[in-house]
Every structure is written in C-alpha cells, then in structure tokens.
Amino acid sequence: MLLLCVSVSKIQGGPFAGLEVAAIVPCYNEEVAVGEVIEGLKAAVDGITVYVYDNNSTDRTAEVAAQAGAIVRTEPRKGKGNVVRRAFGDIDADVYLMIDGDATYEAAAAGLMIETLLSGPYDHVLGVRTDDPEASAYRAGHALGNRMFNKLIGRLFGEPVTDMLSGYRVFSRRFVKSFPALSREFEIETELTVHAVNLRIPQVEVPVGFKDRPAGSESKLRTYHDGFRILRLITSLLQYERPLAFFSAVGAFFAAVSVALGIPLLVTYLHTNEVPRLPTAVLATGLALIAILSLVVGLILNGVLRQRQEAARLAYLTYPPVLPPAQTALELAALDRVQR
C-alpha cells in the first residue's frame, strides 16, 4: 500500500500568510459539538485547514464535520493515540494545531497560540485550561489526577508542567515529524509532554478557556481507567527514558532486603563460625546479585538511551524552525545578498 503525506494549502492573507496551518480534531461520536469547534477554528484563523479524524463514530459526526467545511478522514483503530499517530503521519504542514472535538476548549484562542509558537520560535505551545467557575467540565477527579501527574512528571523529568493532560496544543513541523506516537488512547497527551521535556524542545504554556460540553454530548473519559493507563505509561517511560534511575531504584530495593536478611546471619557467623539458616543466606546472596545485575542493566540501557536521544535530536534538527512569514522573507533576502 502506498501512503502519501498530504500538503496543506498555504494561507493567503492575514498574519499567517504563506504558512501551511493544519488543525487536527480527533472525534468519536461528537455530532453535537464538532460543528461548533470547526466554525470556531475557521473564525479564529482565516484560511486554516481543518481535518476531522472520525474514530469509528456511530452517529453523524463525519457528516456534520463535512458540512461545516472540514476535511474528514477515518481512523478505524479505536483510541485517540491511534488518531494522532495517523494524522501526524498523513499531514505535512508548517504548523499543527490539535484540539478535542467536544467544544470544551476555547477555539478562539487558536490564533493567539499560533502567534505564540511563531514569536519564540517555539516548537510546542500547551494550552493550559482555565476552568470556568460556572462549568463542571473539568471534573474534580480529573483535576486532582492531573495535578498529581503534573508533579510526578516534573519530579521525574526535571521540568515543571502545568497541564500535561490538555488536549489543546500547537506544534511545529519538526516536533511532529520527530514524535514517535506510540500510545494508543488518551495517554497520548502524556507522551507528547514527555517528548518535549526529554528533548528539551522550546515550549511555552498559554492559558485557554475551558467550559462544559454542549447539551446532549457525552464525555468519553473514564477517570480510573484512563488514570491507570497514564500511570502505567509514566512507569514505562521512566523505565525507557530514565533507565539508570529506574534500575538503580530496583537494585537499591533488592540490596536493602539482602542486607536486612544478611546482617543477622553475618553477626551470628562472626560469633559462632557457623552459618545458620542456610536457605536465608542463599536468598540474601541471590538478592545481592540481582541488585548488582539491576545496576549493570541500568548502566547499559543508559548508554543506549544516550544514542537514542542523539538520533531523536538529529531527526528533530532535520527540519528548520517555523518562523513568521515576515521574518522568513527577511532571512531569505539576507541569504540572497550574501550569495551575491
């Protein structure tokens, strides 16, 4: 099968003239809300190309999206992560905007987020949700879990994050084309955040409005199910992205148990020249060997990680930063003068 990466039409006028800007809207049964999202994006950014990825909806999501002026595509594999992977592979643009199709995010902030990306230039702009006091869209359980995961990611990866589970983001081409997109479901936001933190990609946060879903639409989030999946992903990412710390912690645990079991045996041996409880002595020795082996594995994987990070960084640097059209024109003119 031949897969083609589709280029987005360039914007003809306004502050983003000459740029290819694509909005990606993952949807599952969002016929009530998706039209509002598309209209809001088109009003905020004149000339933006909106792609709605229908994730096996059983309602009229695709029909409503097409009527609102979006390009509709279907991703048969269930899960937001599968949709994002497909969209990032399908679309070739200068700037990518990702927003959920449930109309809870402030689509009117799209222009500001894109301007912020270009002003850095940054490669990742995170829309931080500012909850409407009158709204209940941001459930208490989700808010608490989000704060916990934010602190956990900040502690593990060394960079503070305010809203790592936000579904409203803007990316540069080089962010998107260097992102592996391994997640299948809602943990994709965590993977996006860790990718930016791990490669030390220039990023910034922008506050955006967050409100209730339109009447008649239903949330697809499952607080405990999604929370456990995200926690499992963080553990997996810690294992693969911080192997020395992970396996050192594992080794330290086994070493502590080994010492706790072995010291009484050693004290008895020094007094009696006999080894009591031989099975315990064998267990303590085995745990000590596991501790040493864990440390060795961590050191080896840390070397492998360094090579992976170098390869990922080189893939990221393959693409130039996205710049405002005026700045790009000035740089091209300067380059032309130098060449002459």
Regions found by a protein language model. Name each.
Residues 76-90, 107-186, 190, 211-228, ...:
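Acceptor/aglycone-binding surface of glycosyltransferases and processive sugar-polymer synthases
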Residues 54-62:
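A conserved acidic beta->alpha catalytic loop
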Residues 29-43:
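Short, well-formed alpha-helical segments that are part of the catalytic scaffolds
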Residues 30-33, 57, 80, 106:
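Donor nucleotide-sugar binding loop of glycosyltransferases
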Residues 96:
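Short aromatic/hydrophobic "clamp" motif used to bind/position activated sugar donors
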